[in-house]
């Protein structure tokens, strides 16, 4: 069965890759890598079919006369399903230019006449005929081999040792096939493999079964959702309340979200670097860590004349994939299901930062040190306006023969120092570029050679040991990686600023750093990530003290687009070059399961968490303590009422986001 999968993939490469010219870079080593990586995915299917074969064989013991027939039917079914799905995947690629994805759902809902018309343009009938012929031929070969290799044993005796050896070999093979490695722990192939660089080879690596499984799973999960799961009102009523309109809106959602740049600066920004840092959190900047200089470089950067750091910034999603969904598309968080796995055809969103910067004439590059297959990053970023994706294969080739401290990668991908060096070399100084970067070295397993980079591990270890155990600090290795990244990213910013002076840098975290166990009881700590803005040539005005990931894209556009440029966004600019008439900001932010103002964070379950110990209220020395306490309590009650209203806005935002994804921009009841 494993060989059948291999031959299917070879056929895919020969027919679609070479004959149909889908293969852009026919490098032999890359093809071998694709066959090897694809086999790791396919072997899991083979293992499942082997288990099915054994179960049928055991059931056949209750009907010995029919056991052979039952096993033969199972074998034929296995051959047929493997051939059918793989041939169908090849035909599908010829129609849609991709392996099985959400377009398959539309194809299955097409009327018979449409499919018949498609069959005249695409080889649907001929491929089905090929499937029938190959099924019969391969089944015939299989049964001939079976009869030749497994002749009936006339003596009907079985040696226990031989049985044990066969069982052990079978078990080891199953373990290797299922876990994709000789281990009792399964490997996440989407994360661990290094795919081929060629887009076609990358797409076909996981295989038809894997793609179909993801499609069915995600379709079932996503289509259990209803608008009523997010709001009691109708979509029009929700939009009316969210946008504070007097009556139900007549226009579509994109029109309601349209805003214009007020940038009146003559300074042109040639390069934008939007850096999403793995697990970079506000708690990293806590003064308690200043003794070890945990984020000293970023803190020094934020104090520069041309830099700003927001005092309150809230995450928009709880994990990397979902955070990237929000920051790449501009679509607010709906639920924990990845957008590429939402079971619908994703549009190219007009509020996607890549689509907006593309309109402004920027060359859009996405950089990630991990696999390009992860989260379908290649097709996802391309759909949302990026011209190119650079991932682990590019970085490994770049790092070859360079004296980087080993190891240069973790199980997630290539380390951030190499990523930043590659960006410096890959950025064209003669064209406008927008570079979105996702780092990864601060993700477990954290294996940077910290000593080789001069990280003071002994000092950090002493700091951890002196800190009360009740605070449950991260270990020295985790803190060391935060320290290391802080110095690496600022080093990159300094080098990039010199090489590309007309640049804008945005630094944020994807989500709260969960390595700080003790902090999980604190609402601000678990929801807050930093936002640092720096440009050597700009002195923008800060519009708001609070923001979320949704506000980053409109902030960038406000700073780089010409005055009057229209764009779509759920967020609002946080900074502007227009110091006299900047755009407005509501001065509250809607994040992941929480809202934020400059004074507090709020979640219905955890309540108010003030950024200072108590709400700010000037003390009246002439009033006694009881009166002051009453004022404080009244202030808290008013804040809670206000926060509840803001949280209702968050619920409405999720409802509108759901509606936009599943029903489009035209609002209807």
Question: Where in this protein do the model-derived segments appear?
Answer:
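Membrane/wall-proximal cationic-aromatic binding patches
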Residues: 121, 125, 192-199, 205-275, ...
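Solvent-exposed soluble domains appended to multi-pass membrane proteins
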Residues: 244-625, 634-669
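Transmembrane and membrane-interface helices of multi-pass
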Residues: 1-225
């Amino acid at each position: 069965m494993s060989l059948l999968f291999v031959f299917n993939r070879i056929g895919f490469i020969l027919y679609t890759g070479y004959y149909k010219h889908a293969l852009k870079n026919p490098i032999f080593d890359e093809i071998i890598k694709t066959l090897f990586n694809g086999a790791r995915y396919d072997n899991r299917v083979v293992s499942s079919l082997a288990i099915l074969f054994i179960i049928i064989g055991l059931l056949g013991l209750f009907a010995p006369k029919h056991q052979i027939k039952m096993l033969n039917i199972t074998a034929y079914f296995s051959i047929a399903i493997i051939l059918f799905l793989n041939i169908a995947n090849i035909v599908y690629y010829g129609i849609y230019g991709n392996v099985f994805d959400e377009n398959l759902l539309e194809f299955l809902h097409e009327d018979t006449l449409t499919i018949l018309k498609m069959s005249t343009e695409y080889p649907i009938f001929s491929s089905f005929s090929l499937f029938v012929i190959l099924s019969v031929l391969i089944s015939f070969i299989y049964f001939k081999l079976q009869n030749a290799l497994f002749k009936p044993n006339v003596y009907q005796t079985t040696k226990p040792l031989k049985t044990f050896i066969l069982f052990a070999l079978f078990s080891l093979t199953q373990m290797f096939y299922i876990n994709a490695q000789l281990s009792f722990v399964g490997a996440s192939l989407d994360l661990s493999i290094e795919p081929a660089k060629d887009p076609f080879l990358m797409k076909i690596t996981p295989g038809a079964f894997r793609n179909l499984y993801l499609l069915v799973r995600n379709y079932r999960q996503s289509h259990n959702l209803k608008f009523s799961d997010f709001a009691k009102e109708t979509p029009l009523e929700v939009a009316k309340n969210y946008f504070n309109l007097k009556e139900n809106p007549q226009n579509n959602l994109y029109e309601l979200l349209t805003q214009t740049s007020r940038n009146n600066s003559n300074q042109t920004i040639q390069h934008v670097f939007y850096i999403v840092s793995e697990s970079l959190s506000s708690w990293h900047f806590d003064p308690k860590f200043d003794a070890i200089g945990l984020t000293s470089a970023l803190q020094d950067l934020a104090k520069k004349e041309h830099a700003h750091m927001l005092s309150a910034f809230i995450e928009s999603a709880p994990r990397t994939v979902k955070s990237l969904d929000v920051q790449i598309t501009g679509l607010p968080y709906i639920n924990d299901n990845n957008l590429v796995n939402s079971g619908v055809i994703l549009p190219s969103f007009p509020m996607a930062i890549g689509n907006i910067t593309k309109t402004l004439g920027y060359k859009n590059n996405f950089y990630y040190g991990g696999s390009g297959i992860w989260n379908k990053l290649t097709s996802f970023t391309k759909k949302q306006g990026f011209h190119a994706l650079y991932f682990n294969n590019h970085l490994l080739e770049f790092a070859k023969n360079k004296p980087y401290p080993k190891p240069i990668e973790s199980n997630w991908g290539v380390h951030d120092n190499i990523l930043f060096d590659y960006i410096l070399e890959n950025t064209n100084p003669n064209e406008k570029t927008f570079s979105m970067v996702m780092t990864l070295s601060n993700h477990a397993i954290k294996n940077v050679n910290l000593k080789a980079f001069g990280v003071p591990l002994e000092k950090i270890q002493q700091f951890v040991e002196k800190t009360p155990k009740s605070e449950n600090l991260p270990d020295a290795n985790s803190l060391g990686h935060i320290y290391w990244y802080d110095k690496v990213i600022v080093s990159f910013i300094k080098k990039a600023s010199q090489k590309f002076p007309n640049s804008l840098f945005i630094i944020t975290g994807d989500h709260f750093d969960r390595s700080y166990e003790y902090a999980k009881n604190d609402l601000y700590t678990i929801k807050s990530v930093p936002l640092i803005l720096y440009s050597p040539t700009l002195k923008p005005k800060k519009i708001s003290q609070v923001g979320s990931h949704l506000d980053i894209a409109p902030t960038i556009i406000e700073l780089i687009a010409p005055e009057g440029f229209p764009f779509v966004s759920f967020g609002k600019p946080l900074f502007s070059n227009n110091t006299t008439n900047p755009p407005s900001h509501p001065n509250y932010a809607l994040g992941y399961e929480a809202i934020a103002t400059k004074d507090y964070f709020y979640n219905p379950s955890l309540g108010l968490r003030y950024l200072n110990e108590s709400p700010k209220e000037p003390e009246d020395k002439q009033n006694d303590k009881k009166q002051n306490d009453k004022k404080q309590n009244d202030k808290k009650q008013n804040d809670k009422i206000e926060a509840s209203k803001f949280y209702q806005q968050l619920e409405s935002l999720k409802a509108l986001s759901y509606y936009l994804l599943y029903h489009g921009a035209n609002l209807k009841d």
